[in-house]
Regions:
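Positively charged, low-complexity/disordered segments
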Residues: 345-352
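Acidic, mature catalytic/reactive cores of soluble proteins
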Residues: 4-344
């Protein structure tokens, strides 16, 4: 079971998917390989069945969280009298040698040893496909492969410099040097080690520093504005679509039934986000958004819908997941939406 701390989450992402990480360093929401794909971890919506990935430490540890300045790399700091370490969470995001953006469905968890002999247990508890089936693990010398009986085509691979057996058996680990985890949607061809992890960290760090450097600066509240813009960037799909939210089924009122899936692109809301990014120096976001809108026209006389799937899908469906309890028992949990059938005249004014 994953114990939910609060609704104070850090978010990491790479314009393909995103993860919500609690104040104690637990990944409680993650969909692979894309924003609207089935969840791997969803304890946000069901503490018992949803699945999470985190660190168990004694109550003596003090835990704090912040972002690496000017980036979407999240730092969770663990300290006690016995030792101290930091977990740096990020998704690789940078331009490759071919000048294309490299946005793999991957999460790195870089464990940086600071001092002493800190101890922890790893709680690796994936529940693929929205926890709709039995979870199956295969442990090899290189990785832990995980898939779900309800959807065995989608598989996740956990690589680590730590003992995979110790991780699987939840044994206590004493940290003596830098270590890492890599959770990937694909089996890796190249060797995965701590040096590779550091390279991916540096590339991603430089990408975000360059992105914020191109952003307009303000004399007042610049840090708050910059952080808000970084979040807006994370909610953008690489093709230009902008999501209304990174999650599904968080209730408008706890205990109520108005729980919707917002992992889609509503044109009015997206236009406001794009206008903001354009005004502060990111014209490329506006160009990608316009290309996305153009891609939704599949015939000469097509009309606007109020919203689309993040790949431009015009027809969507909604499914209710009865087996999940929902956030604070707020049922139902929904995936998908039928909001595309709604018609509101004011929705396209802002786009124009």
């Amino acid at each position: 079971m994953c114990i939910r701390d609060s609704l104070n989450y850090g978010v990491i992402g790479n314009c393909r998917t995103a993860a919500l990480i609690s104040e104690k360093g637990n990944i409680e929401w993650l969909c692979f390989p894309d924003f609207d794909s089935p969840s791997i971890f969803a304890s946000l919506l069901d503490r018992d069945k949803g699945g999470c990935f985190g660190f168990e430490v004694s109550n003596e540890y003090r835990i704090s969280q912040s972002y690496v300045p000017h980036t979407n790399i999240l730092s969770t700091h663990f300290s006690s009298d016995e030792g101290e370490f930091v977990v740096l969470d990020f998704m690789p995001c940078y331009r490759s040698y071919e000048k294309e953006h490299y946005l793999p469905a991957e999460i790195y968890r870089y464990i940086r040893w600071i001092k002493g002999t800190p101890r922890f247990k790893v709680n690796y508890n994936p529940a693929p496909d929205y926890a709709r089936g039995k979870v199956i693990h295969n442990i090899t010398d290189e990785y832990i492969e995980t898939y779900c009986s309800s959807e065995n085509k989608d598989r996740q691979y956990l690589y680590s410099s730590l003992s995979l057996q110790d991780i699987e058996q939840k044994k206590e680990i004493t940290l003596q040097r830098d270590e890492f985890f890599l959770l990937s949607y694909n089996e890796k061809v190249i060797p995965i080690d701590i040096e590779r992890e550091k390279l991916e960290y540096c590339r991603t760090l430089v990408y975000w520093l360059n992105w914020t450097n191109r952003t307009k600066k303000y004399s007042l509240y610049n840090d708050v504005i910059e952080r808000s813009l970084l979040v807006l960037k994370l909610m953008s799909y690489y093709n230009g679509a902008v999501l209304a939210a990174l999650t599904t089924s968080l209730p408008e009122t706890v205990g109520d039934v108005r729980n919707w899936d917002y992992r889609f692109c509503w044109l009015r809301d997206a236009s406001m986000s794009i206008e903001t990014l354009f005004q502060i120096g990111h014209a490329g976001a506006a160009r990608r958004f316009m290309k996305f809108i153009q891609s939704t026209f599949v015939a000469k006389h097509e009309s606007f819908q109020i919203m689309y799937g993040i790949r431009g899908e015009r027809q969507l469906k909604e499914i209710i997941l009865d087996h999940l309890d929902g956030y604070k028992n707020s049922k139902p949990v929904r995936i998908g939406t039928v909001s595309y059938t709604h018609l509101r005249a004011h929705e396209t004014r802002h786009d124009l």
